[in-house]
UniProtKB/Swiss-Prot annotation:
InterPro entries cross-referenced by the UniProt entry: Enolase, Enolase-like_C_sf, Enolase-like_N, Enolase_C, Enolase_CS, Enolase_N
Major location (coarse): cytoplasm
Alphabetized GO MF terms: magnesium ion binding; phosphopyruvate hydratase activity
Biological process according to GO: glycolytic process
Cofactor(s) it depends on: Mg(2+)
Name of this chain's protein: Enolase
Length: 452
């Protein structure tokens, strides 16, 4: 093995055309790794800090405060000198050294985007030097499980300019026997959904994550279209069984929460403005208490084949999450995203309070590969499922695909069947499945922690 010889960062663009950080790492024995950092739109308030240029000497640059040149400078002038000479395979020591150099709880000094870019690039450089695929370098010989994909085929919330308040409506091909088959099933549903939308006069424009973004009059309407698309594709809308396709939702309820109530603000605006088709919806319920929203979610679960609900309540509504998990946690995934932000301190609290039974894993929420792995391992030890996830602002970087296989998480959420920034991850997983061949497995019981 060899030492880190050079680290260089630059400003590049993500899938929304916003600046993000790219980092390259070079080793003494010609190992090379490059990584790009994703960015979220609906973010948890306790996430590690993504450093932008607003308020810095770079604010007047061409991105008007949204740039990341301060983070880039922090890599090139502060992090790089501190890490030159480190053994490239000492990932944990590298990550801990950056954490110490930053010295803050949420990485606000150097920026989580600066630290994460280096962390991921170091791992890639080590894998490159060893001539190993990244998943095998990270997970060793036991990295073998391909993940069941959650495909976000209808976008709403902060990810689309439409009337849907819940952020993501996803399909999960639970009846597939391989990753390739799962992707094929999802592809059929996606394209048949497009046909249905066109047939009923809806546009097929897409949101940030590649899903369609129609102006539906309710969440039920979105779910009805999904069920019909599944049937039209020749599959069964169900939570289990052969050729079954289930539904998952990300409510992103923190975005709906204010003064102790949940408001469907986008739908409310469409009704108040009397947008075409919304003129006669004045009696629609738009404001919910915690208990009422739990009742509403329970109603949806009883009516549709929903197997996973992410951020069903706001990040500060811990008591509500406890109630939701007690009510529905025996039959579906109650996924914490904003609630726990890939943070082991918050995850430990959620485990103690039984506030969820599944965690969403986003590498940029915590800001290093080491801390990401710690969160996955803590969840698995607590009999929770872990869902490796993209962000709405993505790049062609495919690291999360390798992470999902390396840690045998069994689930991945990385967008729809459009936009290259999403498809790149699926293509990477297809290549991994082919490379592993007979050594690969595909989860037969992905929801292993649910009581049968």
């Amino acid at each position: 093995m060899s030492a880190i010889k050079k680290i260089h960062a630059r400003e590049v663009l993500d899938s929304r055309g916003n600046p993000t950080v790219q980092v390259e790492v070079y080793t003494e024995l010609k190992g090379y790794g490059s990584a790009m950092v994703p960015s979220g739109a609906s973010t948890g308030s306790r996430e590690a800090l993504e450093l932008r240029d607003k308020g810095s000497k770079f604010e007047s640059n061409w991105f008007g405060g949204k740039g990341v040149m301060q983070a880039v400078e922090n890599v090139n002038k502060l992090i790089a000198p501190a890490l030159i000479g480190f053994e490239v395979t000492d990932q944990r020591q590298v990550d801990l050294a950056m954490k110490a150099l930053d010295g803050t709880k949420n990485k606000e000094k150097l920026g989580a985007n600066a630290i994460l870019g280096v962390s991921l690039a170091v791992a890639r450089a080590a894998a490159n030097e060893l001539d190993l695929p990244l998943y095998k370098y990270l997970g060793g010989f036991n990295a073998h499980k391909l993940p069941l994909p959650m495909l976000n085929v209808i976008n709403g919330g902060e990810h689309a300019s439409n009337t849907l308040d819940f952020q993501e409506f996803m399909v999960m091909p639970v009846g597939a026997k391989s990753f390739r088959e799962a992707l094929q099933m999802a592809n059929f549903v996606f394209h048949n959904l497009a046909k249905l939308l066109k047939k009923h006069g809806h546009g097929v424009q897409v949101g940030d994550e590649g899903g369609f973004a129609p102006n539906f009059k309710s969440h039920e309407e979105a779910l009805d279209f999904l069920v019909e698309a599944i049937k039209l594709s020749g599959y069964k809308p169900a939570t289990s069984g052969e050729k079954a396709v289930a539904i998952a939702m990300d409510c992103a309820s923190s975005e709906l929460y204010k003064d102790g109530k949940y408001t469907f603000g986008k739908l409310k605006k469409a009704i108040e403005e009397k947008q075409p088709g919304f003129e006669n919806l004045g009696k629609t319920k738009l404001v919910y208490t915690t208990d009422e929203l739990i009742d509403y979610l329970d109603h949806l679960v009883s009516k549709y084949p929903i197997v996973s609900i992410e951020d069903g309540l706001a990040e500060s509504d811990w008591a509500g999450f406890e109630k939701l998990t007690k009510r529905l946690g025996h039959k579906l995934q109650v996924v914490g995203d904003d609630l726990t932000v890939t943070n082991t301190e918050l995850l430990a609290k959620a485990i103690e309070r039984k506030a969820m039974n599944s965690i969403l894993i986003k590498v940029n929420q915590i800001g290093s590969l080491t801390e990401t792995f710690e969160a996955i391992q803590m969840a698995q030890m607590a009999n929770m499922t872990a869902v490796v996830s993209h962000r709405s602002g993505e790049t062609e970087d495919t690291t999360i695909a390798d992470v999902a296989v390396a840690m045998n998480t069994g689930q991945i959420k990385t967008g729809s069947m459009s936009r290259t920034d999403r498809i790149a991850k699926y293509n990477r997983l297809l290549a991994i499945e082919e490379e592993l061949s007979k050594a690969s497995t595909f989860p037969k019981d992905v929801f292993y922690n649910l009581k049968k």
